[in-house]
Amino acid sequence: MRFRLTKAAKVLISLILAIVVVVGVVFGLKSGLIKNDIKDKKTNKEVNAVLNDTETSDDPDTVMTTDKKSASTINVSLDEWIGWKSIIDANGGLTTQKGSIYDQLGIDVNISVINDATQSSNALIKGDLDAAGYTVNRTAFLSTKFKKAGIDVIMPYITNYSNGGDGIIAKSNIKTVKDLVGAKIGVPEFSEAQTLVVWFVNNSDLSDKDKKDIIDNLVLFATPDEAAKAFFAGQVDVAATWEPYLTQAQNMSDCHILFSTASSSNLVMDGILFSKAFADANPDVVNKFIEGSLKAADKYDKEFDAIKAVMPMFSTSSNEDIVDNCSGAKLTTWKDNDNLLTGSAKIMYTDMCDVWKSIGEDADADMVDSIFTNTYIQNIASEFSATETSVDTSKTKVTEDNKQTVADTEALLGGTASVTFIKNTSKFSDTEAASQELDKFIDIAKILDGTIIEIAGNTDPNPNSDPQDEYNKKLSAQRAEAVKNYFIMNGISADRIVTVGNGSANPVVDNDTEEHRAMNRRTDVSFKIIEE
């Protein structure tokens, strides 16, 4: 379950937590009245062995609605997440209401509220559901389950991006991914928050040993709340969690937000996963389902009756609470989907398969090309494409005012691009090899779309160069610009990029051998978060 509170509620909860957590929890831990619920590691296989045969849920908020009226009926499950609101608004309730968008399009949609992904995936496999809402992260986690069950699935629609609701909090001295080495890191097991930590570790320039040590020694908790409480009680140095704990960390002097999804639209994306058999048999119904949800976007922060009726967690919420929750998820447009389903969604799915494998779980990366399709989005192009634009997900831009701040900010994540240039020029010596090397950084840049990218060119020290190193500075700056231009040609906004020519001032090794000189002729790519 994912949600955000109003600003007033965040402040109140932060004050309460500051008192209760710091005083009450610490006292409780010392006295033995409160036990620290740190989970033993379990594998996905062990969890599924217990839960795979479960078709009912003890969750009191589960609401099943699966009446199949006709071939134009879709049975879909959603968890209690604000990002599904456009689907609910298009439907008008758990069932399609007369005069609603879906009713006008001629389809019936039955919504089941299921917070348990095991239960919803079982129902999808059994055929009780035609579709279910999952994050791309969760879809990767469930991939082998669907494959072993012999059910093909597709995700033809990304509904929303997480927009700051999930993140990583840390002690003040932990500022980069490299600082995670040796730190105690608390994560909620099998959660989107856990995948954030592992994704950053996997995409860092840490050694394989350091990566393995971090991942193998994650401290597992049952929920994001428990991970956060352990952090504020001093039991862990870092915690992957969600709101309101991110705000609490931001308001304290000895800790901070290391990362939140406000700096990345793509790390946590939600979409609707369909049974491929259903979609193949009923393409027009799927088309209209997507069309109706997209057309309901203008109701997102304006109409509230339907979501109050459908989702128990919002049933007593004020309109202000719901609007504040809406800020935690940004709805996608038709244009976003056309781009995502052939681009970032595939990158993210593949990365998440690697994440799950890193922590010992099964995931099928080979399903990436069969799961994501823009066929259905293209089928409704005439309804949207002439006027649609992508959501502007850029949160930060390089300006003259913040260039120095960018330079002074330590990079959250960085790496070295081993790109070689023709001697004394800024031209790639091997364009194909350079492309392969730089593409991995472009993929990261597309995922971390709310970060500033610093590209720093470096040369090896030349004993015959001028004392001020002006030639090397100019050459290294030109080489950084060459890398920047490659980024721009591949879809990265120039507004996000700052280039630096270090000359020969920052060698990484002694310049005593040809191998070492080659190591010093490098381009460093860093991803930085600049607070507004």
Residue ranges of each PLM-predicted region?
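Periplasmic peptidoglycan-binding/tethering modules of Gram-negative envelope proteins
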Residues: 375-453, 529-532
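Second-shell loop/turn segments in exported
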Residues: 74-75, 109-110, 182-188, 235-236, ...
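Short, glycine-/small- and polar/acidic-enriched structural segments
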Residues: 33-221, 237-243, 266
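Periplasmic OmpA-like peptidoglycan-binding domain that tethers envelope proteins to the cell wall
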Residues: 458-532
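N-terminal hydrophobic or amphipathic helices and topogenic motifs
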Residues: 2-117, 125, 333-411
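Secondary-structure end/capping motifs
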Residues: 280-364
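Extracytoplasmic/secreted proteins, especially bacterial periplasmic and envelope-associated proteins
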Residues: 82, 86-89, 115, 119, ...
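Pocket-lining segment of extracytoplasmic ligand-binding domains
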Residues: 136-138, 146-147, 207, 211-315
